[in-house]
Amino acid sequence: CLITNCPRG
């Protein structure tokens, strides 16, 4: 996932 699109790190 992207750094700004990670619901759980």
Curated annotation (Swiss-Prot):
GO terms for biological process: neuropeptide signaling pathway. The modification Glycine amide is found at G9. Disulfide bonds join C1-C6, C1-C6. It comes from the Eukaryota. Keywords: Amidation, Disulfide bond, Hormone, Neuropeptide, Secreted. It is found in: Secreted. One of its GO terms (molecular function) is neurohypophyseal hormone activity. This is Locupressin.
